[in-house]
Regions:
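N-terminal secretory signal peptides and thylakoid transit peptides that target proteins
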Residues: 1-18
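N-terminal cationic amphipathic segment used for targeting or macromolecule association
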Residues: 12-13, 28-30
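Generic macromolecular interface patches on structured domains
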Residues: 20-21, 155
Length: 269
C-alpha cells in the first residue's frame, strides 16, 4: 500500500532537521495518488511536465533509449546562444604555459580522438515544475584536454585552469558595469583527468549550435555549468577565478553545528 505524502509530513520532516529534502530525493511513493490523511492535504506535485518552447527540456515520456537524442537534449545558456563561424574560430591556450598556442578546429580535430559516454545535468534541474528535464546522456567525442595542456607545457606555479566561452554580457560589479565572457574554472588535477575532453561531436554528429559548436568542454561528474560551451580561451592560473559563476552564483551554503553555534560556509558547485 502506498503512503501519501502530505504537507504535514513535510513540516514534520523540516522540524526534525531535514534540511535537504528535494523532489529528486523523495521516495517513489511520494508521487502516488490517494486519499489524504484526516486533516491533511496531498502535496500538489506536478504529474505532467509543462512545456516552454523557449527553454528546451528533456521530455521524460518520449524516452526510448538510454542515449538522449540531440533533438531532445535540454539547452541552457546564460548569455544567449552563440553562432560561431568555424573557419574564423580559434582556441587560445595561454597564461602559465611554456608555449602559448592558438588552434583552429581542424587542428583540434587532428589530436587523438577520445569518446566519452557521460551524463550532463544542470545544477538547477528539479528546482521548479518547468525545470524538470535539464538532464541527458550522450556520447561526446573530441580531443583530450590533458594532451593539449601537456603540449603547451604547464608551468609549475599553475593551480587552476579557467575556460572562457565566446558568449558575453555586461555585469555589474561593485556598482560599475564590465563586459564579461562566460567563464568557469577547474582545479588543475581535475582538468588533467583522462576523461575531460574538448568535444566537437555529440552522438556521432557535429555539435549543434545550442550544444556549443564548434567546441565544448566535457567534464564528467560535474554539473553542466562547468561544461563551457563555445569554448574559445583556456588560461592556466596561479590564483582562483572569482567571477559571477564561481564566487557569487552557483555556490552551495552549508551549516555545520558546533555546540550551540552553526558555522555557515559557501563552496562553488
Amino acid at each position: 500500500m502506498h503512503q501519501v505524502l502530505t504537507r504535514r509530513d513535510l513540516i514534520r520532516a523540516a522540524a526534525a532537521g531535514v534540511s535537504t529534502l528535494t523532489v529528486a530525493q523523495l521516495p517513489s511513493w511520494a508521487f502516488a495518488t490517494g486519499e489524504a490523511e484526516e486533516d491533511g492535504r496531498p502535496v500538489p506535485f506536478v504529474d505532467e511536465q509543462p512545456i516552454d518552447p523557449k527553454r528546451p527540456m528533456l521530455k521524460w515520456d518520449d524516452l526510448r533509449d538510454w542515449i538522449t537524442p540531440k533533438e531532445h537534449f535540454f539547452d541552457v545558456s546564460h548569455y544567449g546562444t552563440q553562432h560561431v563561424p568555424a573557419d574564423s574560430w580559434r582556441l587560445s591556450v595561454e597564461g602559465l604555459v611554456e608555449r602559448p598556442a592558438s588552434f583552429s578546429l581542424d587542428q583540434v580535430k587532428s589530436r587523438a580522438r577520445q569518446e566519452v559516454l557521460a551524463t550532463l545535468e544542470c545544477s538547477g534541474n528539479g528546482a521548479g515544475a518547468d525545470f524538470m528535464g535539464a538532464i541527458g546522456n550522450a556520447r561526446w567525442a573530441g580531443a583530450r584536454l590533458a594532451d593539449v595542456l601537456k603540449e603547451c607545457g604547464v608551468n609549475s606555479d599553475a593551480i587552476e585552469v579557467a575556460f572562457w566561452g565566446v558568449d558575453k554580457k555586461k555585469e555589474t560589479i561593485r556598482g560599475n558595469e564590465y563586459e564579461q565572457n562566460f567563464a568557469r574554472a577547474l582545479p588543475l588535477a581535475e582538468a588533467m583527468r583522462h576523461d575531460v575532453i574538448m568535444a566537437y561531436e555529440m552522438n556521432g554528429q557535429p555539435l549543434s549550435v545550442a550544444q556549443g559548436f564548434p567546441l565544448r568542454l566535457i567534464v564528467p561528474g560535474w554539473y553542466g555549468i562547468a561544461w563551457v560551451k563555445w569554448l574559445s580561451r583556456i588560461e592556466l592560473r596561479e590564483r582562483r577565478l572569482m567571477n559571477r559563476f564561481m564566487a557569487r552564483d552557483y555556490v552551495t551554503v552549508r551549516g555545520d553545528r558546533h555546540g550551540d553555534t552553526i558555522r555557515w560556509t559557501e563552496s562553488s558547485v
